[in-house]
């Protein structure tokens, strides 16, 4: 198969939505997870859906993914760099980010997308790359959104900002190979927060609400389609207007 879509972090909140969307659209989808159980649960015996187990905290993670694709006999036409490591978000009680968490966040948000994109580009079938960033890669944390001591995970924001710039650099580097590289920057998605947080978020967002799970799909679908054939190096912001005021 030469038209598979690879979605890293395919069993998380956004990744699982993307996996289900593209599989329902008839695409061959391969996703990554650290858990065999999550892979089996997601596939659930369905054809055209494949999982590769990998721990992206490993220095050889990109090679592990490529080896997994080779075992499955799949060639990737589109890559969505979506993997996350929630453990890297930790901040000390005094608000200081430990060095280990700076490095872990940059590894999964910058180094991994870079290495995996280049590894797949060498295969010759890759045509589309979408990196997944965050509104905090473009905007500083707003202390009015949070209760209690304000200890923002700056490592996350800085790494996501770097990913946006990496998108532009790779778009230039890979253009001669006819590979388009773009980014989607999301605002806050419902599901991991309580009602009080949602109210505070709504008061700070022009559209007065958080994103729904289903709204995470549209921009990625566009960028991986023929409608975006002449689009590269761009960052599509899907944040309900969070960053415009």
Task: Label each PLM-derived region with a short phrase.
Residues 11-12:
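Conserved glycine-rich cofactor-binding loop
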Residues 25-40:
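Conserved glycine-rich Rossmann-like NAD(P)H-binding loop of the short-chain dehydrogenase/reductase
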Residues 82-90, 241:
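Conserved NAD(P)H cofactor-binding loop of Rossmann-fold oxidoreductase domains
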Residues 85, 130-162, 167-175:
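Catalytic loop of short-chain dehydrogenase/reductase
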Residues 90-106, 143-144, 152, 201:
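Substrate-binding pocket helix/loop in short-chain dehydrogenase/reductase
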Residues 95-115, 130, 156-158, 163:
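Catalytic Tyr-X3-Lys loop
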Residues 141, 221, 232-245:
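Short C-terminal tail/terminal secondary-structure segment
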Residues 175, 180, 231-233:
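Short, small/polar-rich loop/turn modules that mediate ligand/substrate recognition or access, typified
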